[in-house]
Amino acid sequence: MDMDALTTLPIKKHTALLNRFPETRFVTQLAKKRASWIVFGHYLTPAQFEDMDFFTNRFNAILDMWKVGRYEVALMDGELTSEHETILKALELDYARIQDVPDLTKPGLIVLDMDSTAIQIECIDEIAKLAGVGEEVAEVTERAMQGELDFEQSLRLRVSKLKDAPEQILSQVRETLPLMPELPELVATLHAFGWKVAIASGGFTYFSDYLKEQLSLDYAQSNTLEIVSGKLTGQVLGEVVSAQTKADILLTLAQQYDVEIHNTVAVGDGANDLVMMAAAGLGVAYHAKPKVEAKAQTAVRFAGLGGVVCILSAALVAQQKLSWKSKP
């Protein structure tokens, strides 16, 4: 992982979009300020918007367009309805309401969950597979998902199954840790805007500390696996990072970094991220369980983590800070 070569996701207007959607040339700034939602994806076409018009039985005016890295973002007129949501999901396009979206140009904080958000795996499941107890641990995970166990109970029970597993299993998992697409770019982009980036995780320090170091994150907190004589004891040291702990981390860091709560973002995929999402100025469900998606303010369903920057970029339009010259 060459972290010296971290690239940002440039946010800028683009002539290709203007040529594809010439109607956006003549929109007034007043109309843009009224806009309340966006659509984004890797390649937006007039045909997709015609499908949306047909399905919603109305004309959906595009007020502005810009690029965020490889993504294309459209600022939309009118209200986002459940009909819009249905057709956009079918077209595999992301969308978000943008009222009160945090301001990228002011000090900000983003707190990410780790497992299945910052990285593509659930670390405990991978450790368990290598320790030969994959199925037992997966069964406990399933019970927790069904709400039979709370997070702390399920974590302690799963970790207990790892008793006597060799410590080198952890380094095996860490060596091939698959980052979520665009995690490094998300971090680099937000750092370039002067934002702070943190991980708050019910996972393990062995992995979150590694990510903190590799990506130059500002903070990371998760659970510590007890290791004695090169073996896991099956115990977690100290207090478990719970759903409430995650929210507390966000609030404490916001205070520490002098960031207004409005300018905080929480990103996660599981039920234990909901308290943190509710505490933040903007809660984003990322490739999340339906229950989590339903309760979150907004969601990224198809994009990588660059989708979070797509949502935040909308504030630049309202402030007339978007130009042909790329930001950050």
UniProtKB/Swiss-Prot annotation:
Top-level taxon in the UniProt lineage: Bacteria
Entry's Gene Ontology molecular function annotations: L-phosphoserine phosphatase activity; magnesium ion binding
Active-site feature positions: 113, 115
InterPro entries reported in the protein's UniProt record: HAD-like_SerB (IPR050582), HAD-like_sf (IPR036412), HAD_sf (IPR023214), PSP (IPR004469), SerB_N (IPR041449)
GO cellular component: cytoplasm
UniProt xrefs under Gene3D superfamilies: 3.30.70.2020, HAD superfamily/HAD-like, Phosphoserine phosphatase, domain 2
Pfam families in the cross-refs: DUF5609, Hydrolase
Catalysed reaction, written as an equation: O-phospho-L-serine + H2O = L-serine + phosphate; O-phospho-D-serine + H2O = D-serine + phosphate
Protein name: Phosphoserine phosphatase
UniProt source species: Vibrio cholerae serotype O1 (strain ATCC 39315 / El Tor Inaba N16961)
